[in-house]
Structure formats: structure tokens, C-alpha cells
């Protein structure tokens, strides 16, 4: 998957909710803070743990192939074609906030007892104060922040702590 920083504190929170199909795992945070990479790393973990590729549905709504999905009806149709009702399906939806009425799709997925659902989002529609009213059913929010200074040093492989700190202050903690 490339050379990405493994942000274990977030992956462990996601892992803790694995197979809890009654709970939607909502990964929030500002744009460019690493939510998509964390979700991709989790999908890779699922594969390595033996989950068949066909049981993982990963949709990145910013990718060209999925930009035609604009409404909850279109998303439901796409998912319905891929979900096997006899097997556990891991549904990972990246940047869902641009799909009209996305919360309807999440509520329908949450009603499916064999779907383990994970979503990311960046804008005000995904604010924690609104999630409870927008998503019927249970959910847990995992908020992702920009890189900490120690993560920044690890990612850029710095050995000079002082130089790294000055650059961190100038550039910020976005990966």
C-alpha cells in the first residue's frame, strides 16, 4: 500500500469495533488529516486477516469510478449488487458526505445484520453534534487529528529534533 505512517492509536479504535454490526464506525476529522489512509490500512488489515476480497466493499467517493454515485438510491443499488446476505460484509465508505441523503443508506446498512460499516467524512454534515440525529441507530465516532509532533518526526524520519520542531511549526501536522 505504499509508505504510509501507521497511526496505531486510530487503527486500534477501529479494530475494537470490528464485527459489531449494530454500530456504524464514523471516522471524522478535517480534510487531509489522514482518514482515507487509515481506512485503506484497515482494509488491508482485513485482507491480511483472511477476509476474502469479495467480502470487503471499499468505496472512495472521490475516485472517478465512484463519482457517478450521487444519491442514497444509487449507493443502495451499488451495495445491493455486492453484498452477499449469507456472509459478513465489511463496507468502507470514504468521504460519504457528498452523497445526497447518505444517512438513509447508513441506516439501511445498519439494519443489515451481516454488514460491518465504516465511514469517513470531512465537512459540517459529519459533525458529532449532528451525527446522532442524522444516523438512526448506534454509531461510534473516531476523530482523527493532524499528525502529532512525534508522528511528524517518524513520518519524515528526522533525527534532529530541534530542526524538526521548527519545520513542524512552519508546515503543520497534515500528512
Q: Across the structure, where does each feature detected by a protein language model lie?
A:
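Conserved catalytic/switch belt of AAA+ P-loop NTPases
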Residues: 103-119, 132-133
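N-terminal pre-Walker A segment at the start of P-loop NTPase domains
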Residues: 1-17
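Interdomain motor-coupling "hinge/lid" segment immediately C-terminal to the ATP-binding subdomain
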Residues: 124, 128-175
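Conserved lysine of the Walker
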Residues: 35
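Hydrophobic anchor at the beta1->P-loop junction of P-loop NTPases
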Residues: 27
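P-loop (Walker A) phosphate-binding loop of NTP-binding proteins
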Residues: 30
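Short glycine-rich substrate-engagement loop in P-loop NTPases that contacts/grips substrate
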Residues: 57-89
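Hydrophobic positions on the alpha1 helix immediately C-terminal to the Walker A/P-loop
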Residues: 38
Amino acid at each position: 500500500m505504499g509508505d504510509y505512517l501507521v497511526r496505531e492509536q486510530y487503527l486500534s479504535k477501529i479494530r475494537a469495533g470490528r464485527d459489531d454490526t449494530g454500530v456504524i464506525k464514523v471516522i471524522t476529522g478535517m480534510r487531509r488529516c489522514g482518514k482515507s489512509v487509515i481506512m485503506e490500512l484497515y482494509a488491508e488489515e482485513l485482507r491480511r486477516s483472511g477476509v476474502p476480497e469479495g467480502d470487503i466493499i471499499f468505496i472512495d467517493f472521490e475516485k472517478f469510478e465512484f463519482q457517478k454515485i450521487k444519491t442514497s438510491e444509487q449507493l443502495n443499488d451499488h451495495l445491493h449488487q455486492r453484498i452477499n446476505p449469507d456472509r459478513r460484509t465489511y463496507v468502507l465508505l470514504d468521504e460519504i458526505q457528498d452523497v445526497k441523503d447518505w444517512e438513509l443508506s447508513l441506516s439501511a446498512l445498519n439494519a443489515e445484520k451481516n454488514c460491518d460499516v465504516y465511514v469517513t467524512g470531512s465537512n459540517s454534515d459529519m459533525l458529532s453534534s449532528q451525527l446522532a440525529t442524522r444516523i438512526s441507530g448506534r454509531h461510534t465516532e473516531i476523530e482523527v487529528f493532524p499528525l502529532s509532533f512525534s508522528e511528524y518526526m517518524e513520518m519524515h524520519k528526522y533525527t534532529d529534533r530541534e530542526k524538526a520542531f521548527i519545520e513542524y511549526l512552519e508546515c503543520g501536522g497534515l500528512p
